[in-house]
């Protein structure tokens, strides 16, 4: 089984770039593995790192245990699950991406089928024998397997399973208001499996239990059914009553006391046959006592002294509920509950009792989390294995609910993270496999009963197709299985750490209220309060904080250092605690430490206690944050000076960083936060040195490194000393951005362990680099930067600072049609020879060709229907002897906006019988190469063992058959080791009497077999590729793919942004000499509007601009962690060192006139990003296209080739200008005047005057809708002739006469129908 190997993460060596860190709080804790949320969950589900002993109740194994064993209806035969095995993927990750395949593993499960009793069976030759237990390995489908970067490859595209945040199983107490009435309290039991159960009081203080939403019962009825038969039993649960002995001597002391339970004539057990003497809740008087004594009743139930008080809700609720209880015994209660839930009477009491036990206890499965929450809320102490609801739970819930009614208990906050848990990828897969295996078990049950039992085998019973279809539909269509955002490394990482409240079993964006979307105090250090979408999903999709982890139960934890007696325990590891463990604890911020060496805190500190922020003495504090950026997610932690930005703009900044396009030449920011280095380690494409060594050779595609291995490493390793690393070149990402890696080391360079060897895909020197540092001036520029518009220098475009590469994929298929086979060909009919120059012999455009609109990308011909041949065709047929014109050109051509370069072409085809012999020869070649490699490995192994064992005394060496090949006591030498180990299968045991040597031998053999396994997998993959061919969907014979790279420079209309939510559109590209310039002649590269800063309250960009300028001048980088960044004094210090004006205020000169501007301008260096919202993708103009069927208006959007929306505000603008003719044209002919637009088209074609428009279709729709309401609307055009011109007035009237006529017609129709019916009935009666 192939393990998920995590991406290498090493510390970076010291680089030439000097970085100054402004952090006052130094992180004493390293960042956790950011991909743990995905990888750990998946490995736990498949039990990859577990031993067989620990596997029994975990993940995938648990799914089988839930549904197996399965028996037939007569319980004769049983099929049981034994174990499962997961096989390595057939294709590598790279192959799956290129070929459009799924990176999956094959699962085989071992089953046995046996008979419950021994019985002789007759076989074909009439001999008899006993039915033997059959063991079989069954193919159990495939499952997409997680890549080391935490994603899945499904049908060639990378996907992510987003974790879901949903309500935790357990019990929750709440209240809701009814106007002018007391509050209604309720307790809701939410199980892991089964229906919800709710206990609630009403306005009369009666407690009901709600089942299946609508069904409700008094709670005392349920208690009776559960064994608390008598009233006194129910009252004793809550300690409200006592049983007393009564006689003629002591009766006086009971006068005035209240009866707690009914009194019957004879024994309580036979009360159904007897009359009730006294009802409950009666104050005992002398004549009541006389009745009791007369019937010789010795024991009565009374309420305890001072308990009967109307304000006591304990008494009131139980007493009122008993009043409403229609039952008097357990039998009655059982029948009553059965009748309420099933709407029918049970056959007997036993059936009713079994149904109640199954409904409340067997089907209500709490799960481990539900039991934990119940224990925590109700202060119980049941083991976590006890995962079924019990009587004690119900009684405790009733007590807590009464306490809530009595204001002695707080209401639960359902939005608190203590009551919400995360469903990670492993748990979601577990849910899908339970659905799939449940279907498989149903099929097994059907087959085991139908088939001949005597010849049953597991292979005949089990069909894994149903399971595979469930898993594939989950990965392909589920709301939580999403197409991975791969725009840049940050977008990829954020997507993997995303937490969604939507999805199956979660919330819907339409119903989710403000409370659930709002920031909760429990989110601190767990869910980022900043990063969330801006649209309808705001607050429903969040991101994990930097240090947050998810525990085994699915609750989010965050780390804290302990504080003891006012001192931080820095030497100990921080503890991770969940929201419910944090409740009531005093926690302070990371910057509250006075002395970092001793850990002493400041005297009076503001702390956080739940949702409050009091100031307390330092000795009372329990915990302290581990870092200042603990509160934020990765994206928010990358924004320098975040503390100076408004939260809304910080949200936009963190979202827009994920939209930034990887540039051709990116640069790491001068002003960063320190997280850039750590995040770059998770870029899967980057390569780091595995040890110290020298670079042997470097080219664009490969880096070869020769490592210096120690003597021990040389002895153990079977790998070559020179390791070759392949670089990813121009790979298309999901968002069509370009993933291209280039080397940054040179031949002969010495590399150290952990050193980055390459860069690219938004990284530079091992740092995240999403954009460029650019010189900026905050000033107006002739109105061109009005409303956030951006003015840039021509130099930026010329030097390709913001140039990016985008890759588009075009494909064409060849099918076998009814008329014949389609074909990829160079010989395209009616096509110029010049245009064919770019095509290869298969008709596919050559790699390196420049593509222009109209160029053929893939040449294809398709057979077409034959008509009657013309005389010319007959003539050509007679000359050339073949049919002409029976094919048509169906080639793929470049569209009107496509300009680029072909970077790759591929043809995928199914296996053909002609290639069989060639393939067999290649397989032989592969087998021979594999055997050679095995022999070499064997020689290497023997040499290594000789080196270790020569001269040692043998302890008895065995082969794989456990036969002794070297006897005990024999001295080992070269000859006997070579002879005996040459052809023997080696197993490990204690070979010699030396522990150290035995350990070395064990490791050598282990690495030997690992290497063999690696070679076997490679051989299997290569053979598979040859035998199976390319995996193509049925009906398709060949697929040709062409990848075209487009180089996009920065244009007017492209969207840009900073890291502080300061976004804008490029409005004008100005010549470098016309841009404002500094006193030394340096022109600025970017001009931003200063009015975009104060109203948006994102001053962080100003701080960054000033410090960035100082960094550029001094040639140093700065690290300013969030909430612990550089102060104004520290920034001023570096601007003074760089001889720059304070706060960047400097006088600029006009580039066109050379005149000095009147006012000083803020100038500096800011980090800008180019976003994936480019004008080339947005520009669109409609000529002809589809219309809406109802309104007859053009559709909207570029994908539908729609028109531009002209709303009411645009109409006002045209009205204000008095552009009546344009307005009329837009509202009629260009919109929904069906007849008018055809006439207009005809007039344009015929070059005639455009006719007057007719009535828009939207008006006809209005008429139809009014008719639907029974209103008849008519248009009357009145023409009045005057002296000079003719005026036309339009009068619209709704006439009541028409409505009356309509109603009369309806009545007449009804009367006619009635008459017809009467006539038919009279005729039928006459016949009878």
UniProtKB/Swiss-Prot annotation:
GO terms for cellular component: DNA-directed RNA polymerase complex. GO terms for biological process: DNA-templated transcription. Its EC number is 2.7.7.6. GO terms for molecular function: DNA binding; DNA-directed RNA polymerase activity; ribonucleoside binding. It catalyses: RNA(n) + a ribonucleoside 5'-triphosphate = RNA(n+1) + diphosphate. It comes from the Bacteria. It is an enzyme of class 2 (transferase). InterPro entries: DNA-dir_RNA_pol_bsu_ext_1_sf, DNA-dir_RNA_pol_bsu_external_1, DNA-dir_RNA_pol_su2, DNA-dir_RNAP_su2_dom, DNA-dir_RNAP_su2_hyb_sf, RNA_pol_bsu_bac, RNA_pol_bsu_CS, RNA_pol_bsu_protrusion. PROSITE patterns: RNA_POL_BETA (PS01166). The RNAP catalytic core consists of 2 alpha, 1 beta, 1 beta' and 1 omega subunit. When a sigma factor is associated with the core the holoenzyme is formed, which can initiate transcription. HAMAP family: RNApol_bact_RpoB. DNA-dependent RNA polymerase catalyzes the transcription of DNA into RNA using the four ribonucleoside triphosphates as substrates. Belongs to the RNA polymerase beta chain family. This is DNA-directed RNA polymerase subunit beta. It comes from Karelsulcia muelleri (strain GWSS) (Sulcia muelleri). The lineage of its organism: Bacteria, Pseudomonadati, Bacteroidota, Flavobacteriia, Flavobacteriales. The gene is rpoB.
